Amino acid sequence: MERRQRGFTLLEIMVVIVILGVLASLVVPNLMGNKEKADKQKAVSDIVALESQLDMYKLDNSRYPTTEQGLGALVKKPTTPPEPRNYPQDGYIRRLPQDPWGAEYQLVSPGRHGKIDVFSYGPDGMPDTDDDIGNWNVGNGAHNNGGNGNGNP
């Protein structure tokens, strides 16, 4: 017996390619938007967690770390004044997270937007741009009293 093999015609292959192209043009932008949202949400979660640990630091030591001491004060006891009086042996966190774009989170204490400012420079990595994500614009309102950190605007 003779078997006859039949393949796809060029037209059928072209139709499949066009359909895949149309699907890709619809799906890829949605996926990219979700990645941006997920990155921003991770930054917000990290900032809220860092803020919580900074509050613990303040409870133990009656003040937040200074800008110079930075967020590293949560990992290792600062040796620059003012040195914390009641620092836990293992620190407040094991290591500092990086923001979703591979940069370090920032601390300004006292903050420009509240008692402390904890923030990421955002996707562009540049300071003082519209895409910065900070505790003053994440919606929890815990430290964004709109002033200089002492309750006065």
Swiss-Prot record:
It is a single-pass membrane protein. One of its GO terms (cellular component) is plasma membrane. Keywords: Cell inner membrane, Cell membrane, Membrane, Methylation, Protein transport, Transmembrane, Transmembrane helix, Transport. The modification N-methylphenylalanine is found at residue 8. Cleaved by the prepilin peptidase. Methylated by prepilin peptidase at the amino group of the N-terminal phenylalanine once the leader sequence is cleaved. One of its GO terms (biological process) is protein secretion by the type II secretion system. It holds the Pfam family T2SSG. Residues 144-153 have a biased composition (Gly residues). The chain crosses the membrane at residues 8-28. Its main location: membrane. Residues 1-7 form a propeptide. InterPro entries: Bac_GSPG_pilin, N_methyl_site, Pilin-like, T2SS_protein-GspG_C, T4P/T2SS_Core, Type2_sec_GspG. Belongs to the GSP G family. Core component of the type II secretion system required for the energy-dependent secretion of extracellular factors such as proteases and toxins from the periplasm. Pseudopilin (pilin-like) protein that polymerizes to form the pseudopilus. Further polymerization triggers pseudopilus growth. Type II secretion system is composed of four main components: the outer membrane complex, the inner membrane complex, the cytoplasmic secretion ATPase and the periplasm-spanning pseudopilus. Forms homomultimers. This is Type II secretion system core protein G. It comes from Dickeya chrysanthemi.
